[in-house]
Amino acid sequence: MYIKPKKFNKVLVANRGEIAIRIFRACSELGIKSVGIYSKEDKYALFRTKADESYLIGEDKGPIDAYLDIDGIIDLAKKKNVDAIHPGYGFLSENPEFVRKCEENDIVFIGPSADIMNMMGDKINSKKIATEVNVPTIPGINHPIRDYEEAKNIAREIGYPIMLKSSNGGGGRGMRIVYEEGSLEIEYQTACSESKKAFGKDIIFIEKYISNPKHIEVQVLGDRYGNIVHLYERDCSVQRRHQKIIEYAPAFSLDENIRKRICDDAVKIA
């Protein structure tokens, strides 16, 4: 089915700092008016002066919460006749509730749909998707662990060390490394508790732990017409507590054949 392309006349950038400036510039180059938002703490920040229009958001909120004010951002977008919202990265960029609010108010969210976010935001589900298209995954399971006894049996089958992971985890949280069976029970209980507290769910699965791996990510870009391309890879291996510190591209340590396979696999999953 043909979907007529929609021309954007005005785009709101729901972010701050350098990424907001980059999006403002892209809008300018495309002849699109840009709308910026800023917290009261950012009143004199450089980025707010780079948008065609700029408005205070979340006046009664803190410097971070202001940029997480979904209702406030949507209300402003409607008042200013915004066609689309670009989330940048961080903040609301991976929040399916924000995407649904945009859809409900006939505002285009420049990014994945809420369904895709929910689908790929669940690590167990994303492993299933990768398996379905014959993309290799780390040895482990692709279903939630029911209890400690099941965790013990699976760990024995996979072999130690293993990693307990929250299916809804992110940002370096929700992971526990277990080197031997003697510490599995306490680590399993801790993983469930941390996952419940941080992500609202205690859904845990197990993977083989790989020491000092190369953490390679591939950026993909798709449109509503089914066209998908990759934008090559970046190396995110420099980490502290499972949180990325430095990313660089290209990943110069990759063999060319492996690079092609990884990028092709990313497109297959997308």
Each model region followed by its residue ranges:
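N-terminal beta-alpha lobe that positions the nucleotide/phosphoryl donor
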Residues: 1-270
